[in-house]
Amino acid sequence: GIFPYGFVLAASIFIPTLQLTFVTGKAPFQKLSPIAAGIAMFVTVWALGLAQYFFLLNWAEGPGRPPAPPVAGFGPIYALDWPAMLLGMLILQMVFFLLLKGFPFNGIRNAGVRFVVVNVFTIGGGLLLHWALRAVGMSDGQISALAGIITAAVVIIEILFDGWPFTGPDRAATRLGKITLAAVITAALYALLFAIGSIDYPNSPGTPPVELWMAGTGLNLIAAWAIVHAAVFGRWPFRVAGAAAPPGPVPAERSERQPVDG
């Protein structure tokens, strides 16, 4: 079957897509026409995903591992270890570039410098975050669950509810309020999904941990439905009168995210 091989490739494409959309603000393609930019981004993320698959990852067989696919890479990292590392990057993408709208990096005036800094931060920082979480005893499954649920919490706050109730002029207080609310929602969802997922969950060799179900529920059900609810149904009935329209690909404060070349 296509699982888990296609899952690894999809994750390797998904994270660069978010990077170009939320983190870099479509740079370096922001000056192209919408169609040209879309094609360029599509080709770029697929090229990056395939490069990861073939040159960074491997499917070395071993006890408890699935058989290698007919077409496998020859990199140094075992393929099923890679998605959890990517999800460390996802946490930073969601918190800093969706929830906090690019803060504090939108204070960097030079667009080229900002492009380099945000990429180094999310890629290098994401790998360091994964290492730190592993160092404190979290499994890759738990890291995946945490990333999926943080994503769900941020999407609920920023896309479904448009940041409400933290929409006042005091940006520092707004950021603090959003971070606190995201932490509360994350903790509540993690506990709830773990309790639900553990009911009669099979505990046999070869069965994926319940945390992978939690990650999938957070990403594919909760976050995806919140995005559809905002984009298709206009947040009804949750939309606050006078709230902005559902955010586009880069939900950012224009005053803080306009590229300024130095």
Task: Identify what each model region corresponds to.
Residues 16-18, 42, 55, 78, ...:
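Acidic, low-complexity intrinsically disordered regions
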Residues 12, 71-77, 84, 88-100, ...:
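Intrinsically disordered, low-complexity regions
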Residues 40-56, 83-94, 114-131, 149-154, ...:
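Alpha-helical transmembrane segments of multi-pass integral membrane proteins
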Residues 14-38, 62-67, 92-116, 154-177, ...:
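Cytoplasmic membrane-interface regions of multi-pass membrane proteins
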Residues 1-10, 29-35, 54-87, 105-112, ...:
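Membrane-helix interface and helix-disruption motif detector
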